[in-house]
Amino acid sequence: MTEDDCKVAEALNVSRETLGKLEQYADLVRKWNSAINLIGRSTEGQIWIRHIQDSAQLWGLRAAPFGTWLDLGSGGGLPGIVLATIATEKAPESRFVLVESDQRKATFLRTAARTLCLNVTVHAARVEQLPPQRADVISARALAPLTDLCALAAPHLAPEGMCLFPKGANYASEIAAARLSWNMEPEIHPSVTDPSAVILKLKAMAHV
């Protein structure tokens, strides 16, 4: 780990065991990345800052306590695997459901979950194919515009649940577009890794 990586790791405020699991995860991503493109090749050297810290920041915005966390379009496990790793220490009674339609990436997710001994279920399917999950928290990183995310998440959200959606600099236009189809009042939280990015926290939404 570089000096910057160590600073990120320290800021996560987790045990040495959890940090060790996150290091294992980072190694797995690098190992598999050449074959199935889990993250951009140019970001491999910044995996702690660009990916692990960026994913881990969602933990502080979660519902507490929570039972089920549903991660849509999990890809290489960002944020799902990172958050499930933190949960082994912070919320061991919780479970994570990761949805990824790409069979190769779903295989990676299962491998990572098994290697790290995580309470994770992986569905190699499209979100629309799943029965309602009644999730307490739903996340999705770099999956779709907010309008589409609302449509994907709504059938799976528990009555008192929440959604956490990281968004880039154009988040305001995404909110405006989504409000044409959805009644919602998202909380806007600044990203700790990118000054132009935010996390949108939605506690309730209803189709117009």
From Swiss-Prot:
Protein's UniProt keywords contain Methyltransferase: yes
Binding-site residues for S-adenosyl-L-methionine, renumbered to this chain: G73, L78, V127, E128, R141
Pfam family, one: GidB
Catalytic activities: guanosine(527) in 16S rRNA + S-adenosyl-L-methionine = N(7)-methylguanosine(527) in 16S rRNA + S-adenosyl-L-homocysteine
Superkingdom of origin: Bacteria
UniProt-listed Enzyme Commission number(s): 2.1.1.170
Family: Belongs to the methyltransferase superfamily. RNA methyltransferase RsmG family.
Function: Specifically methylates the N7 position of guanine in position 527 of 16S rRNA.
Protein name as catalogued: Ribosomal RNA small subunit methyltransferase G
Organism: Cereibacter sphaeroides (strain ATCC 17025 / ATH 2.4.3) (Rhodobacter sphaeroides)
